[in-house]
A protein has these predicted regions:
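Flexible, compositionally biased loop and terminal segments
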Residues: 1-234
Length: 234
């Protein structure tokens, strides 16, 4: 199997703790985190990756204080509108995954507009996971399978393909490297199906402090690893 890094997935963790260390409100950390998101996205677009998926808002994040959730929704809408030129100027295709029905119509329309405006770009895709949870995604895929089953599924491999083709990430490569910033060592219900053979990397660097140079170092480590995909390799 190909060892090339095509799909990088990132759990962007540490905005709130970063702000607290600076005696600032959590919103300050989220704003700085958006700048990091932009910097990392442009770096990936310029370094021949095919796909970057960023965990922006989980299905569990609705449990946060309403004031913080409201701020995040406003910030997301502003980002998608303000950075339209960034996507167009850097040939970045934008895609959102997750249960978008959980958002307001205005925000959904903003998401769909940027997807439509960038759909013609082919070389690099930035994916934002929004109102996303892997269990929710897999459940929706099974629901779709039950509601419109194929004529015959005789082999387990066929069943796996049917599920994969009903996930939000269909037509995207499987995850090669899953990175989490902020020091926590858990996957937090993120791309569990797609990361079955991904290399995992956990860094203590808080997301607002994370730089393209840090990413370069992690990718260098990725290429030193031997990816076996279940095989025996000498």
């Amino acid at each position: 199997m190909d060892n090339t890094l095509k799909h990088l997935a990132i759990i962007m963790d540490g905005n709130g703790r970063w702000a607290k260390l600076k005696n600032k409100a959590r919103a300050y950390g989220h704003k700085k985190g958006v700048k990091t998101l932009k910097d990392i996205t442009i770096w990936c677009a310029n370094h021949k990756l095919e796909c970057l998926t960023l965990y922006a808002f989980s299905t569990e994040n609705w449990k946060r204080p309403k004031s913080e959730v409201d701020f995040l929704m406003k910030m997301l809408k502003k980002y998608l509108k303000d950075e339209r030129s960034t996507y167009l100027n850097n040939n970045i295709r934008f895609k959102a995954i997750g249960d978008l029905e959980g958002f307001s119509k205005e925000l959904r329309d903003t998401i769909l507009q940027l997807e439509n405006d960038t759909r013609h770009f082919k070389d690099f895709t930035q994916v934002l996971a929004l109102n996303y949870g892997s269990k929710n995604e897999i459940s929706r895929a099974f629901k779709s399978l039950l509601e419109s089953p194929p004529s015959n599924i005789s082999l387990l491999e066929s069943l796996e393909n049917e599920i994969s083709n009903r996930l939000d990430t269909r037509n995207l490569p499987e995850v090669d490297l899953l990175l989490r910033t902020g020091g926590e060592m858990r996957l937090s219900n993120f791309l569990l199906w797609q990361s079955s053979y991904a290399e995992l990397f956990f860094t203590p660097i808080l997301w607002p402090d994370f730089t393209p140079k840090d990413l370069e170092n992690i990718i260098s480590d990725f290429y030193k690893r031997v990816r076996k995909f279940g095989e025996l390799k000498c």
